Amino acid sequence: GSSYQLSPSGNFIATMVSTKENVCEIKDDTMQEEMASGRVLVVTDLRTMEPKVLSGTTAGSSVASFSWLNDEQLLVTTDARRGYDGYSLYTINKDGSNTTRLIQAKDFKSKAGIQVPFLVGIYQKFPNKILISINRQSVVYKNRDLYWLDLTTKKTSLIARVPSLPANETFAGWELDWNGVPKGFSTYDEKGPDMGLVNSFYLFDSKNDS
């Protein structure tokens, strides 16, 4: 998510706030300094201007990204210092209570690599589910199939699989309508004389997807 975001009603704003002194300097940070979290997630009631800190700065309590699900809950990812679990998706109430893991990033059972869920879309007309993508193969950013994730049951439903492509093309992303339905996708040339020069767009019919 962005560094600040209004809730659906506009009554609350969530912000990532630095806990460090704002100093303008250029230096080479050590790895430990780069990994140390210096930001916390704060939700402020704009009607009363009362802030509430939702996260800390340690690996076990730090929030890395966030998006509003509704006026009561946010979807968050946690600090990457927690390992694979830093890529899992969680919900948390706007008052900082009831942190719940929705879906876990995990090792593939039969091959190397990890399976990582990414948020694709939150639709107010579908309050009980969100659209996510999950990588089908070991490379995290390739072959990311689309799923609905039920916020109550935590179960996923496959919507669309990345289709087979010519050897020189690589899948770039889905084209979705306002209901989260995939209508097309884009690719780019990764090999051959048009490498990096050609982007293609395809129509997609989820009814015929196998």
Predicted regions and their residues:
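Beta-propeller folds
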Residues: 1-210
